[in-house]
C-alpha cells in the first residue's frame, strides 16, 4: 500500500472528498485518511513547497481526466459557496491499490483514442512527390511530425512540382498562342493570295478597257474625218452649183434690162397691093423677116442692102456708092425676085417710075 503525503488545510478536506467521490470508489481513502491517527502528519520542515505540490499534481495520470470530466459536466455542479485555497500545511494521503486500479480503468478509454489521432496525422504523399523523392534517393516517414530536414526536403519537392506545373501551363498557353498565330498567318496568307488574284484580274480588265478606249478613239477620229470629207464634198458641190447657176440667172436678168440705145432698129418693108395686075411683088418683100433674130446686125445689113437696090435713082446720075460690108454680109444679096424690077428700070434708060407706082412702107421694129 502506497502512502502519499499532502499538506492540507482543514477547509480542504471537503474539496478532497468531493474529488474522490467524483472519481469513483475513491471515497474510502479520504475517510481512512481522516480517521487515521494524527501521528502521520509531518512537521513543517519536512512539508513540500507549493511548487513541489504542483509538480506532483501534474505528474499524476488522473487529473487530466478529472479535469475533462469537470469541464464537460454541468456548470451547476461547480458553483459552490466555498472558496478553496491551498494552505501552508501539508498532509499525506495513502491510496490503496484498488483505488489506483479503478483510476487506471477509467483512463484506459482515453489511451485507446490516441492511435486514432496518430492515424489522422499520417503523412500523405502524391505519386509525383513519391517519384521525385525516389529519383533524389530520399525517403520520408509515413507519420508526422517530421524533422526540419525532412520538412525542407518535402518543401523542395513540392516547389519543384509547382514549378513544373506552372512551366507546363505556360508551355500549354504558349502552344495555344503559337497555334492561334499560325492559324492567323495561314488565314491571312490565303486572303493575300485571293487579293493578289483579284488585283491581277482587275489589271487585265483595266488593260482590256484601255484597249477598247483606244479603239473607240480611233473610230471617233475616223468618223470625224469622214464627216469632214463629206461636208467638204457637199460644200464643193454647192459652190460649183452656185457658180453654174448664178451666171445663167445674171444673163437672163441682164437681157431683160438692156438700155434702149443698144437696141437695133429693124425695118420691115411691106408692099401695098398695086393696080397693075401683071406686076407682081417680089417674093422677098412678101416674106416677112423673122421677128426673133439672133443677130440684129446681120438683119440690119440685109435690110439696108435690099433698100439700096430698091431706092430709085435720078437719070444720068452717078452710080451709087458701094459701101464695104463685113465678111458676113459679103455673100448677102437681094432676092431673085428683085432682079426683074431692076431690069425693067434699066430698060427704060432711066430711073423713071412705072405707070403703076408701088408704095413702100417702112416699119420700124425694135429687136432686142
Curated annotation (Swiss-Prot):
UniProt subunit comment: Homodimer. Interacts with HCFC1; the interaction is required to stimulate CREB3 transcriptional activity. Interacts with CREBZF; the interaction occurs only in combination with HCFC1. Interacts (via central part and transmembrane region) with DCSTAMP (via C-terminus cytoplasmic domain). Interacts with OS9. Interacts (via leucine-zipper domain) with CREBRF (via leucine-zipper domain); the interaction occurs only after CREB3 activation and promotes CREB3 degradation. Interacts (via C-terminal domain) with CCR1.
All ranges on the Cytoplasmic side of the membrane: 1-229
Domain bZIP residue range list: 153-216
Name of protein: Cyclic AMP-responsive element-binding protein 3
Positions glycosylated per UniProt: 344
The organism of origin for this protein: Bos taurus
Chief place where the protein resides: endoplasmic reticulum
Residue ranges, annotated region (Transcription activation (acidic)): 1-95
Motif (LXXLL motif 2): 57-61
Disulfide bonds: none
Localization per Swiss-Prot or TrEMBL: Endoplasmic reticulum membrane; Golgi apparatus; Nucleus; Cytoplasm
Lumenal domain ranges by topology: 251-368
Sorted UniProt keywords: Activator, Chemotaxis, Cytoplasm, DNA-binding, Endoplasmic reticulum, Glycoprotein, Golgi apparatus, Membrane, Nucleus, Repressor, Signal-anchor, Transcription, Transcription regulation, Transmembrane, Transmembrane helix, Unfolded protein response
Amino acid at each position: 500500500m502506497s502512502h502519499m503525503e499532502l499538506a492540507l488545510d482543514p477547509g480542504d478536506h471537503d474539496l478532497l472528498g468531493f474529488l474522490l467521490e467524483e472519481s469513483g470508489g475513491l471515497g474510502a481513502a479520504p475517510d481512512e485518511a481522516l480517521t487515521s491517527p494524527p501521528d502521520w502528519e509531518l512537521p513543517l520542515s519536512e512539508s513540500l513547497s507549493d511548487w513541489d505540490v504542483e509538480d506532483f499534481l501534474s505528474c499524476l495520470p488522473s487529473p487530466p481526466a478529472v479535469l475533462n470530466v469537470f469541464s464537460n459536466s454541468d456548470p451547476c455542479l461547480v458553483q459552490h459557496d466555498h472558496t478553496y485555497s491551498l494552505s501552508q500545511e501539508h498532509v499525506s494521503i495513502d491510496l490503496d491499490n484498488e483505488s489506483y486500479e479503478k483510476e487506471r480503468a477509467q483512463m484506459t478509454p482515453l489511451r485507446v483514442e490516441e492511435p486514432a489521432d496518430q492515424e489522422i496525422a499520417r503523412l500523405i504523399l502524391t505519386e509525383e512527390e513519391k517519384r521525385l523523392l525516389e529519383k533524389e534517393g530520399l525517403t520520408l516517414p509515413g507519420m508526422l511530425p517530421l524533422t526540419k530536414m525532412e520538412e525542407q526536403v518535402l518543401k523542395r519537392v513540392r516547389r519543384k512540382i509547382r514549378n513544373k506545373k506552372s512551366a507546363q501551363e505556360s508551355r500549354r498557353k504558349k502552344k495555344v498562342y503559337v497555334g492561334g498565330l499560325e492559324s492567323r498567318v495561314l488565314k491571312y496568307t490565303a486572303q493575300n493570295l485571293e487579293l493578289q488574284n483579284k488585283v491581277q484580274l482587275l489589271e487585265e480588265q483595266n488593260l482590256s478597257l484601255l484597249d477598247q478606249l483606244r479603239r473607240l478613239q480611233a473610230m471617233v477620229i475616223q468618223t470625224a474625218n469622214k464627216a469632214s470629207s463629206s461636208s467638204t464634198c457637199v460644200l464643193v458641190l454647192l459652190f460649183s452649183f452656185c457658180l453654174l447657176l448664178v451666171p445663167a440667172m445674171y444673163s437672163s436678168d441682164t437681157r431683160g434690162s438692156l438700155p434702149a440705145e443698144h437696141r437695133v432698129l429693124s425695118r420691115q418693108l411691106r408692099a401695098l397691093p398695086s393696080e397693075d395686075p401683071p406686076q407682081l411683088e417680089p417674093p422677098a418683100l412678101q416674106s416677112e423677116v423673122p421677128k426673133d433674130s439672133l443677130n440684129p446686125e446681120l438683119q440690119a445689113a440685109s435690110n439696108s442692102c435690099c433698100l439700096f437696090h430698091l431706092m430709085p435713082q435720078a437719070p444720068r446720075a452717078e452710080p451709087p456708092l458701094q459701101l464695104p460690108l463685113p465678111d458676113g454680109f459679103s455673100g448677102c444679096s437681094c432676092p431673085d425676085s428683085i432682079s426683074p424690077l431692076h431690069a425693067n428700070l434699066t430698060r427704060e434708060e432711066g430711073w423713071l417710075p412705072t405707070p403703076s407706082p408701088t408704095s413702100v412702107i417702112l416699119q420700124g421694129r425694135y429687136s432686142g
